[in-house]
Every structure is written in structure tokens, then in C-alpha cells.
A protein has these predicted regions:
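Mature N-terminal segment immediately following signal peptide/propeptide cleavage
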Residues: 1-25
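Charge-rich, well-structured scaffold segments of protease-associated domains
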Residues: 4, 12-15, 62-211, 229, ...
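Primarily extracytoplasmic ectodomains and periplasmic/lumenal surface modules that are beta-strand-rich
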Residues: 18-21, 33, 192-194
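A cross-taxa feature marking solvent-exposed loop/turn segments within ectodomains of secreted
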Residues: 19-21, 57, 179
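M16/MPP (pitrilysin/insulinase) zinc-metallopeptidase core fold and M16-derived inactive scaffolds
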Residues: 23-85, 151-155, 263-280
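Generic solvent-exposed, charged/amphipathic alpha-helical segments
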Residues: 196, 200, 258-259, 271
Length: 282
């Protein structure tokens, strides 16, 4: 069942009679594409900040652990997703926690500086100090020229995170972490009407906030091949190819399936072709 609360929050519930666990997921329609090109990496930074507690609940993980639960999150270009899995009898603990940090995240300068250091170190380890680490970034910048898909969720450069001010971070939170920009889903062996009632109890009192302006630019159609050669101190040469496809509702939305068939692992067609040609020693 699906319901939109008075403050704009979309709630989707599903009764699962098999599991004794409840899965509570909240998706914010705020990803890397919603960032200022001069301040990239904010969506991923918030994935970290959202676990740093609120004024009412300073330690987010402790109540989850006391409820015998687990939690995590991930960010991509289109959205940021948070989830908690715990025994169904403790489902309100998850709703309490998620509703609290949707409105009352405590972003102190000290917490911000700590998470900025963590994210910058992650950037360096995974993308700058690792062989081939910057290859996906080079490919993105080649494939997209104006659309924000041209940068990864980690951001364009560590300096964007290093230079982020508390006011800029707070503005991003207020603009994107609001009821009408989120989807709450609950799956548990609980009556669906009961789950909707619980969602209303914990989330409907939250005030909505004005929507952030959408400045996402349309990517021009690519009319000619693009190539880039980057010289790096790496053990072997690698080649990456990328092809534009239609949106998720277009017939070409099956492209990820073809990608898996062609290049998804040792049994894929391209792997056999490269190996049989003698170009690869693997």
C-alpha cells in the first residue's frame, strides 16, 4: 500500500508474512546530481553526517544495537538511501530514529570537521592513491560535459569538501532532507494499515520545507566519438568504453542486462574474446 502524508512524505508498506524482521528504508531524492558544481561531494558527506546524531539522540547507532538491529546507507548520483533492519516488534525504534534525524540533525562544526577528514581520506585512498582509481572519474568527465553525472558521488576534488562551510552544509540539509523529498518504505509481518498508522504517528508532525530549485542541465546529444589517453604508473594498460543510453522508461533501459552479458565476469562474451585473442594473461 502507498500513501502520501500531509507534509508530502511518500509511504510505501508491504506485509511480509515470512520474515520476523522489519526492514525500514528511507530514500532521499538528493544525490550527487543535486550538488553545486563548485561544492561536489555533499550528498556523500551527508551519508556520513546522518549517523552523527541529533540533539535528542546523540548516538544514532546505540538504540539500533539495543533493538537488536543493523543499519547502513549508500549514495549514488540520484539519491541517498538509509535502511534499518531489526525485529518487527521494534519497528517503532527505527521510525523514531529516522523521523528524528530528518528534522533535527545536529551538525556541529566539530562533527563536520571530523566527517570532512574521513571523506577526504576516503577520496585519496580509493581514487587518488590507488592504481586505476581515477579511471571512472576520467570516463565520467568524457561522457558528460554539462550534466552533473560528470562527477562521481565522492565529488570532483577533495578541496570541495575541505572548503565546505557549516552554513553551506546546513543549507544542503534544509533543502533536501525534508518530507516531500523522501520515500519511506516498511516491510514486515505487520498489518499494512498498522504500518501506515505508525508512519503517520512518527512523520506527519514534521513540517515540510520549501523545495530546492532544480538547476540540472540537459546533456547535449553526443554526435562524435570521444577519446582520452591518460598515462599513469600502473602495471598494465586498461581500456574503458562507455555508451549513452535512454532513460529508465525507454526501451534501452535493458542496457545493464546487455552489459552483464557482454562483460559481467569471467563467463562473459568479451572476456572470452580478449582471452582467446591473447591480449590478456588472465
Amino acid at each position: 500500500k502507498k500513501k502520501i502524508l500531509a507534509n508530502g512524505l511518500t509511504v510505501v508498506v508491504n506485509r511480509d508474512p515470512v520474515s520476523k524482521l522489519a526492514a525500514v528504508n528511507i530514500l532521499y531524492k538528493a544525490g550527487a546530481r543535486n550538488e553545486n558544481p563548485e561544492r561536489t561531494g555533499f550528498a556523500h558527506l551527508f551519508e556520513h553526517l546522518m549517523f552523527r546524531g541529533t540533539r535528542r539522540i546523540p548516538n544514532f547507532d546505540l538504540p539500533v544495537q539495543m533493538a537488536c538491529g543493523d543499519n547502513n546507507a549508500f549514495t549514488n548520483n540520484d539519491y541517498t538511501d538509509f535502511y534499518i533492519t531489526l525485529p518487527k516488534d521494534n519497528v517503532e525504534t527505527a521510525l523514531w530514529l529516522e523521523s528524528d534525524r530528518m528534522e533535527g540533525l545536529d551538525i556541529t562544526p566539530e562533527k563536520l570537521e571530523t566527517e570532512k577528514r574521513v571523506v577526504i581520506e576516503e577520496f585519496r585512498q580509493r581514487y587518488l592513491n590507488q592504481p586505476y582509481g581515477d579511471q571512472p572519474m576520467l570516463l565520467r568527465a568524457l561522457a558528460y560535459k554539462v550534466h552533473p553525472y560528470r562527477w562521481a558521488t565522492i565529488g570532483l576534488t577533495p578541496e570541495h569538501i575541505a572548503q565546505a562551510t557549516p552554513d553551506e552544509v546546513q543549507a544542503f540539509y534544509r533543502a533536501h532532507y525534508r518530507p516531500s523529498n523522501a520515500i519511506l518504505s516498511i516491510s514486515a509481518d505487520i498489518d499494512e494499515e498498522k504500518m501506515l498508522d505508525l508512519a503517520e504517528k512518527w512523520f506527519e508532525p514534521l513540517a515540510n520545507r520549501p523545495a530546492a530549485p532544480d538547476h540540472i542541465r540537459q546533456e547535449p546529444v553526443q554526435t562524435a566519438p570521444r577519446r582520452e589517453v591518460a598515462e599513469r604508473d600502473v602495471p598494465a594498460t586498461t581500456v574503458s568504453l562507455a555508451f549513452h543510453m535512454g532513460g529508465r522508461t525507454s526501451p534501452t533501459s535493458t542496457s545493464p542486462t546487455w552489459s552483464d552479458l557482454l562483460a559481467g565476469g569471467d563467463s562473459a562474451a568479451l572476456h572470452h574474446l580478449v582471452k582467446s585473442s591473447g591480449c590478456s594473461r588472465r
